[in-house]
């Protein structure tokens, strides 16, 4: 992969102190990856260029919201296997956040165990307010915690999470860039009512990256955000390409259309992902999963041809012919999924207290 040498690894300074005794997890011994993993980055996979640096990254990354969040002491073997298959399949971009429960910890632990810490392209987030307007102490502590959890002394992309306190935090990120603590600064959101606000930072060329909700069903980003990103040379990460698993529920039991074979599409995950990453503005999609078999399906979207503009229209028309597609957002998220990490535990406790 065409990336400059990275020097990210550092000792986990005060690691146990940072996590708290109750959340501390053992660092795993080194584990070998499949012998062919280095070849997975060959020219046969779909790569995208980061406009601000010219380096290339694979167009399919890995998200970690809910899927990597497990309670301390619970089995994590499935997460280890997800990362292994992701890496062996050619993936390099992993997205996480301090808000994702134990997600950062799992990424850091297994990346270290596999010996890939220095080679990952990590995108992370800041959700910070401070003790008073202009106070950046919370942001600094968040960055330091993320570095310790991920075992990095530099984060590739740091983004203002959901535009929280964005006008105070974005200048902080720009300072961190100058100091070499991060490489790129960005903003994120996934809720459609905030897309207008998100678009302003892209249109004003104030960021290097933008992370946005975009899928074959949710295409609002095409109106302002994606055109502005193309015009200003801003990298675009896509969250929720599967609509929180709703798309899979919609097509459950349905065969792929015959024309999918023209693109080498073997499953619905690749259908949805190839549609997303074929947009010229998209740099990388970050589907999340806790299922190793699903990860193998996802990373397969890096191979084979991508749809052109006419094929994208055909793929969309096919989805529009399926009952329930237009009202997909009205259905419950994560159908059939059972996530039991710190986040879900806290949400359940809050709901119980409100009764």
Q: Could you say what each language-model-derived stretch is?
A:
Residues 9-17, 25-42:
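N-terminal twin-arginine translocation
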Residues 1-11:
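N-terminal secretory signal peptides
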Residues 50, 224-355:
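Structured C-terminal cap/extension of enzyme domains
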Residues 51-54, 108-118, 147-151, 177, ...:
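Acidic (Asp/Glu)-rich catalytic clusters
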Residues 129-220, 224, 230-237:
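Glycine/proline-rich, positively charged
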Residues 30-61, 74:
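C-terminal segment of N-terminal export signals and the immediately downstream linker at the start
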Residues 50, 62, 94, 107, ...:
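Conserved, mostly hydrophobic/aromatic
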Residues 95-111:
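Glycine-rich, proline-tolerant flexible connector loops at the mouths of alpha/beta enzymes
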């Amino acid at each position: 992969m065409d990336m400059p040498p990275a020097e990210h690894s550092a000792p986990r300074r005060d690691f146990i102190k940072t996590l708290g005794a109750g959340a501390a997890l053992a660092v795993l011994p080194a584990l070998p990856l499949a012998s062919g993993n280095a070849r997975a980055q060959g020219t046969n996979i779909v790569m995208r260029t980061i406009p601000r640096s010219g380096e290339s990254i694979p167009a399919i990354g890995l998200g970690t919201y809910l899927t990597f969040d497990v309670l301390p002491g619970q089995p994590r073997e499935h997460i280890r296997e997800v990362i292994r298959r992701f890496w062996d399949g050619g993936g390099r971009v992993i997205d996480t956040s301090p808000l994702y429960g134990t997600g950062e910890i799992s990424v850091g632990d297994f990346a270290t165990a596999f010996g890939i810490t220095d080679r990952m392209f990590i995108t992370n987030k800041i959700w910070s307010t401070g003790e008073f307007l202009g106070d950046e102490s919370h942001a600094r502590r968040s960055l330091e915690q993320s570095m310790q959890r991920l075992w990095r002394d530099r984060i590739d992309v740091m983004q203002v999470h959901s535009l929280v306190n964005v006008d105070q935090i974005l200048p902080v990120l720009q300072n961190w860039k100058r100091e070499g603590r991060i490489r790129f600064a960005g903003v994120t959101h996934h809720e459609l009512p905030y897309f207008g606000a998100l678009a302003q930072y892209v249109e004003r060329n104030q960021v290097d990256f933008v992370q946005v909700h975009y899928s074959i069903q949710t295409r609002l980003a095409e109106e302002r955000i994606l055109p502005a990103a193309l015009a200003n040379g801003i990298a675009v990460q896509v969250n929720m390409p599967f609509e929180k698993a709703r798309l899979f529920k919609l097509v459950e039991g349905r065969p792929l259309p015959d024309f999918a074979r023209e693109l080498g599409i073997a499953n619905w995950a690749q259908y949805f992902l190839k549609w997303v990453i074929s947009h010229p503005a998209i740099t990388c999609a970050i589907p999340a999963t806790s299922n190793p078999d699903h990860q193998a399906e996802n990373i397969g979207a890096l191979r084979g041809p991508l749809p052109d503009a006419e094929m994208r229209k055909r793929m969309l028309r096919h989805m529009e012919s399926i009952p329930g597609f237009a009202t997909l957002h009205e259905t419950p998220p994560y159908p059939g999924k059972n996530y039991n990490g710190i986040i879900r535990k806290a949400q359940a406790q809050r709901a119980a207290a409100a009764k």
